[in-house]
Structure formats: structure tokens, C-alpha cells
Regions:
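The conserved Walker
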Residues: 10-11
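ATP-dependent small-molecule kinase phosphotransfer cores
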Residues: 37-98, 102-104
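The feature captures the helix immediately C-terminal to the Walker
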Residues: 19-20
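Conserved phosphate-donor/acceptor-positioning beta-strand/loop module used by diverse small-molecule
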Residues: 97-103, 114-132
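Hydrophobic anchor at the beta1->P-loop junction of P-loop NTPases
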Residues: 7
Length: 132
């Protein structure tokens, strides 16, 4: 049975660097969980690689269908942007291991959706003097 490793921590603690290194490990193969977002795509991004880019209408359809595992919304200058994980059939914890970067709140919701046995937390903490 696979596991989902959930990396968490404050900004600038090295989560992205650790994430990239772990994805390169061959001893423990990890798959990426590609999140969804309603924010606009940026010039260097590709749909399905960094995120699945969608809109509020599609989010509402997924929500009504019970497909949203966890979601967060941020109020921006441009309006609300959602980031969310969807049960779209791409997560197969029976046969694969996954690596995710998220918040404590998204970890809790993901654990409630799957189970404590399948979603394992790693909280990265770095002294503020080093981090900043």
C-alpha cells in the first residue's frame, strides 16, 4: 500500500528544495499530486504540470459532485483565488507513493479524506534567523 508524504512548514524553510530532491530519489519513487487552482496561469507554467488551471464554475461543479478533497481560498487584488486537491482518479494509494507540499489545514483535510495511516506529515522548521 502506498503512502502520501505531506511536507509542511513556514515560508522559506526549504520545502520546495526538499520536495525536488525527494522526487529525484529512485529508491523511493514518488508521484506528484497536481493541485487545481482558479488563479490565472503564468507565462512559464503549463497546465497539468504546476497546476490544473480551471475556473470558479468548474470548482463549484467538482464541489457539488463531492470531488474536492481539500481547498483553500486567498483574497487577492484580482479577486479570490482557490487552490484545491481533487479526487479525479489520479491518486492511487493502493499502488503509488505521493509527495505533496501543503498547509497544516490542507494536511488535516487530506488525512480526513484518506486516513492517518496513508497520509504522513513532515513539518519542516528552521530558525527564523536562518529562514529570513
Amino acid at each position: 500500500m502506498g503512502k502520501m508524504i505531506y511536507l509542511m512548514g513556514k515560508s522559506s524553510t526549504g520545502k520546495d528544495t526538499i520536495y525536488k530532491h525527494l522526487l529525484q530519489w529512485k529508491e523511493i519513487p514518488f508521484e506528484k499530486v497536481v493541485l487545481y487552482t482558479t488563479r490565472p496561469i503564468r507565462a512559464h507554467e503549463k497546465d497539468g504540470r504546476e497546476y490544473h488551471f480551471t475556473d470558479e464554475v468548474h470548482y463549484q461543479e467538482l464541489f457539488k459532485a463531492g470531488k474536492i478533497i481539500e481547498d483553500r481560498v486567498y483574497q487577492t487584488f484580482y479577486g479570490p483565488w482557490r487552490y484545491f486537491t481533487v479526487d479525479d482518479g489520479s491518486i492511487d494509494l493502493q499502488n503509488q507513493n505521493y509527495l505533496v507540499i501543503g498547509t497544516l489545514e490542507s494536511f488535516v483535510k487530506t488525512t480526513e479524506y484518506f486516513s492517518k495511516d496513508q497520509v504522513l506529515p513532515i513539518y519542516i522548521e528552521v530558525d527564523d534567523g536562518i529562514r529570513l
